Curated annotation (Swiss-Prot):
PROSITE patterns registered for this protein in UniProt: G_TR_1, G_TR_2
Domain of life: Bacteria
Localization (cell): Cytoplasm
CC terms in the record's Gene Ontology section: cytoplasm
Protein name per the record: Elongation factor G
Function: Catalyzes the GTP-dependent ribosomal translocation step during translation elongation. During this step, the ribosome changes from the pre-translocational (PRE) to the post-translocational (POST) state as the newly formed A-site-bound peptidyl-tRNA and P-site-bound deacylated tRNA move to the P and E sites, respectively. Catalyzes the coordinated movement of the two tRNA molecules, the mRNA and conformational changes in the ribosome.
GO biological process, one term: ribosome disassembly
Length: 704
């Protein structure tokens, strides 16, 4: 079935975001059950949930990959992007937030707003995603709806609108009161799967609380919406339609967040949640036109726009790549404008290459339905793309556009991985290639000295999951090293006239090459990734023939790969070749390469070499009472506090801390703050290691 522009008002692209145990997967499962996609309820406890379809996730009970699932509620199509709730996977959360129009934030009725939910909420703020809240697990001992609403206001700085009240609490939780229509919905014990619920008048015991709740709601909506404010000032009661329309406007503009409640596990409250998704969250038509730039316009000075219409030229964003055992590589696309048909040729505007669209599928968690055409505003998976990776744009060849590219942070933690057998070596190659396609925050390098494969990622859990996927999906048996920090070396002073002569005489042609070099430090740009290497040739009068100069350069570069202190790459160096000598018969490229390499090593060891380490920008969000502890701990990790600020009722500490001091930080921070603080960490720059620490690292590297 192809959606047409007329249907766009009836499409919702939503994500379900939550803290790790708030019941996100269960809530998604129930949505799929009530919309008729699933006929047996999948429980995360049993490891059978439809959305968590990678074996990894079923074992851990956490959701890692955002599978996109399509379902229908009444006459509305809902595309659900399942987002991971763990901090190491924030890259996936960010990626899915880009392609959503709205989100449902699920909270645990007992725990309320947990640290991870704060982090995901801030990311959603960054992308201006309108959302509604579902306070789940209302049947749990200690569940408190009002406390959750207060926490959403205080901790997240949001403006919550309680549109429901719970009937009963904990094990007596029976249903909800609709504060807009002033009715009660009660789930009868006779329908254990919750398909049936009765709409009744509000029970007397709740009449007063419901009336107060309704008045509070109208008052809060009036503050966020001029139309209701006028009625309110005139003393008129808004109709249900007026109230719903005003809440929708306030939700889409970000002025307010409707809050609902229920228990997904006990099958209560999910149908009203579906009604709220349709009523309050935006359709693709409510979202502003997406912006991008012309691929030729390198400075991105001119902004191009694409409106969500089939009349506009095609623009689609690849937001997820997955491998399917039967179909091969699946690329998930969000179509922002135009139409996509199977067999069509489109342009990948980032790489400037053409791609042919194979089959197009609408995905239902782990089942799929083939379609031939898809229009603006929809989310689908396509087969047959050769060159497209995550974050790239596919567009009409005649109207190229690059939708803002997603920036991926550089990985900060690495482990060596060693295949056990020859056949594991081959499997490892395939696994690494596939995983790197799916996840741009995962990088692979080879350590030239040890020949080991080194994989790097965003955190300890991130790497653990990747390694487990290699074992499970690709059957790679491998030994895994300990996580390591990527150090660098540089020099601090200039040395001049360092001479080295390489000569070897063993009957017949020998080897001969003499070089004289200067070595001086270059300013290192902070990312430490810059090779920071320059080579200047000052040879005159043919003292070294021109054809041997590149060999001297190559020798110096090779030597720079393994520094003189602890064998880490040397950066920020300028080599000047000043003088030399050659022999008509015995000189060769190899002789000059060796001479260059040896002269470089000698010069570097005289040039006051120092060790550099990656320093991370760490941002800790903590309740005020733990502030002193958090700062003291960061100082003990050689951290430099940069700033402290208040944000939505919590304190934010920003500091620069060496990565080597951050291992195991997540556990320490949790225990210091009872799990209430959270942190983010991104690479900041390379900085010199203090000499006492440097001596330890060097001794360790030399095996002393």
């Amino acid at each position: 079935m192809a959606t047409t522009a007329l249907d766009l008002a009836k499409v919702r692209n939503i994500g379900i975001m939550a803290h790790i145990d708030a019941g996100k997967t269960t809530t998604t499962e129930r949505i799929l059950f009530y919309t008729g996609v699933n006929y047996k309820l999948g429980e995360t406890h049993e490891g059978s949930a439809t959305m968590d379809w990678m074996k990894e996730e079923q074992e851990r009970g956490i959701t890692i990959t955002s599978a996109a699932t399509t379902c229908r509620w009444n006459d509305t199509t809902i595309n659900i992007i399942d987002t991971p709730g763990h901090v190491d996977f924030t890259i996936e959360v960010e990626r899915s937030l880009r392609v959503l129009d709205g989100a449902v934030a699920v909270f645990d009725g007992k725990e309320g707003v947990e640290p991870q939910s704060e982090q995901v909420w801030r990311q959603a703020d960054r992308y201006n995603v309108p959302r509604i809240c579902f306070v789940n697990k209302m049947d749990k001992i200690g569940a408190d709806f009002q406390r959750c609403v207060d926490m959403i206001r205080e901790r997240l700085g949001a403006n919550p609108l309680a549109v429901q009240l719970p009937i009963g609490a904990e094990s007596d939780f029976q249903g909800v009161i609709d504060l807009i229509r002033m009715k009660a919905y009660v789930w009868s014990p006779d329908a254990p799967k919750g398909e049936m619920y009765d709409t009744i008048e509000i029970p007397d015991a709740y009449a007063e609380a419901a009336q107060e709740g309704h008045e509070r709601l109208v008052e809060a909506v009036a503050e966020a919406d001029d139309e209701i404010m006028e009625l309110y000032l005139e003393g008129q009661e808004p109709t249900v339609e007026q109230l719903v329309a005003a809440i929708r406007r306030a939700t889409i503009s970000g002025a307010a967040v409707p809050v609902l409640c229920g228990s997904a596990f006990k099958n209560k409250g999910v149908q009203p949640l579906l009604d709220a998704i349709v009523a309050y969250l935006p359709s693709p038509l409510d979202i502003e036109a997406i912006e991008g730039h012309d691929p030729q316009d390198k400075d991105e000075e001119v902004t191009l726009q694409r409106k969500p219409s089939e009349e506009e030229p095609l623009a689609a964003l690849a937001f997820k790549i997955m491998s399917d055992q039967h179909l091969g590589k699946l690329t998930y696309l969000r179509i922002y404008s135009g139409v996509l048909e199977s067999g069509m040729q489109v342009l990948n505007s980032i790489k400037g290459r053409k791609e042919r669209i194979g089959k197009i599928y609408r995905m239902h968690a782990n089942k799929r339905e083939e379609i031939t055409r898809v229009g603006a505003g929809d989310i689908v998976a396509v087969v047959g793309l050769k060159d497209t990776t995550t974050g790239e744009t596919l567009c009409d060849q005649a109207n190229p556009i690059v939708l803002e590219s997603m920036t991926f942070p550089a990985p900060v933690i690495e482990v060596a991985i060693e295949p056990k057998t020859k056949s594991d070596q081959e499997k490892l190659g395939t696994a690494i290639q596939r995983l790197a396609e799916e996840d741009p925050s995962f990088r692979v390098t080879t350590d030239e000295e040890t020949g080991q494969t080194v994989i790097s990622g965003m955190g300890e859990l991130h790497l653990e999951v990747l390694v487990n996927r290699m074992r499970e999906e690709f059957k790679v048996e491998a030994n895994i090293g300990k996580p390591q920090v990527a150090y660098r070396e540089t020099i601090r002073r200039k040395v001049e006239g360092v001479e080295y002569t390489h000569k070897k005489q063993t009957g017949g042609a020998g080897q001969y090459g003499r070089v004289v070099i200067d070595l001086e430090p270059l300013p290192i740009d902070g990312d430490g990734d810059s090779p920071g290497y320059e080579f200047v040739n000052n040879i005159t009068g043919g003292r070294i023939p021109r054809e041997y100069i590149p060999s001297v350069d190559a020798g110096c570069q090779e030597a720079a790969q393994f520094g003189v202190l602890a064998g880490y790459p040397l950066v920020g160096i300028k080599v000047t070749l000043q003088d030399g000598a050659y022999h008509d018969v015995d000189s060769s490229e190899l002789a000059f390469k060796i001479a260059g390499s040896m002269a470089f090593k000698e010069a570097a060891s005289k040039a006051n070499p120092v060790l550099l380490e990656p320093v991370m920008a760490v941002e800790v969000t903590t309740p005020e009472e733990y502030m002193g502890d958090v700062i003291g701990d960061l100082n003990s990790r050689r951290g430099q506090i940069q700033s402290m600020e208040e944000r939505a009722g919590t304190r934010v500490v920003k500091a620069l801390v060496p990565l080597s001091e951050m291992f195991g930080y997540v556990g320490d921070l949790r225990s210091r703050t009872q799990g209430r603080a959270n942190y983010t960490m991104v690479f900041h720059s390379y900085a010199e290691v203090p000499s006492n620490v440097s001596q330890e690292i060097v001794a360790k590297a030399r095996g002393e």
